[in-house]
Swiss-Prot record:
Name assigned to this protein: Transcription elongation factor GreA
Biological role stated in the UniProt entry: Necessary for efficient RNA polymerase transcription elongation past template-encoded arresting sites. The arresting sites in DNA have the property of trapping a certain fraction of elongating RNA polymerases that pass through, resulting in locked ternary complexes. Cleavage of the nascent transcript by cleavage factors such as GreA or GreB allows the resumption of elongation from the new 3'terminus. GreA releases sequences of 2 to 3 nucleotides.
PROSITE patterns noted in UniProt: GREAB_1 (PS00829), GREAB_2 (PS00830)
Database matches in HAMAP family: GreA_GreB (MF_00105)
Keywords noted in UniProt: DNA-binding, Transcription, Transcription regulation
Similarity annotation: Belongs to the GreA/GreB family.
Pfam families linked to this entry: GreA_GreB, GreA_GreB_N
Gene: greA
Gene Ontology MF annotations: DNA binding; RNA polymerase binding
GO process terms (BP): DNA-templated transcription elongation; regulation of DNA-templated transcription elongation
Length: 158
């Protein structure tokens, strides 16, 4: 199976979610199933069927997280020498050459991406256009709104 790039924080978040699902959510669902069984006829017991459905979702998510963590390639850029090159995990400050608007993005794994927080997926068009570029480079990024030109003014490995 293919390795999944992940930051240290992304791996921590998945481990926290896995711990919650296994130690809190799973026991809650088991209890709900047991209570629903006590109500009798399982064929027409909506509570029972809802709890079983929740159990399926929970177990599926547990398997998904365990699979991702098992194939994770955890990258800690803070331990790498900063040579000004944009890599996975780097925080990049860009200036839109048309509007002079400054934006900051951190390139992270798919599960960590949150554009409102400035976290972009390594597979996003912006990240793909930035990876491998260097400090002071000018890059053209194809976005849904068209091609946008950015200057890379800062690259941090934090």
């Amino acid at each position: 199976m293919q390795q999944i790039p992940m930051t240290v924080r992304g791996a921590e978040q998945l481990r926290e979610e896995l711990d919650f699902l296994k130690n809190v959510r799973r026991p809650e669902i088991i209890k709900a199933i047991a209570e629903a069984r006590e109500h009798g006829d399982l064929k027409e017991n909506a509570e029972y069927h809802a709890a079983r459905e929740q159990q399926g979702f929970c177990e599926g998510r547990i398997q998904e997280i365990e699979g991702k963590l098992g194939n994770a390639q955890i990258i800690d850029v803070s331990k790498m020498p900063n040579n000004g090159k944009v890599i996975f995990g780097a925080t990049v400050v860009l200036v839109n050459t048309n509007t002079d608007e400054e934006v900051t993005y951190r390139i992270v794994g798919d599960d960590e991406a949150d554009i409102k927080s400035g976290l972009i997926s390594v597979n996003s068009p912006i990240a793909r256009g930035l990876i491998g570029k260097e400090l002071d480079d000018t890059v053209n990024i194809t976005t849904p709104g068209g091609v946008v030109e950015f200057d890379i003014i800062e690259v941090n490995y934090i």
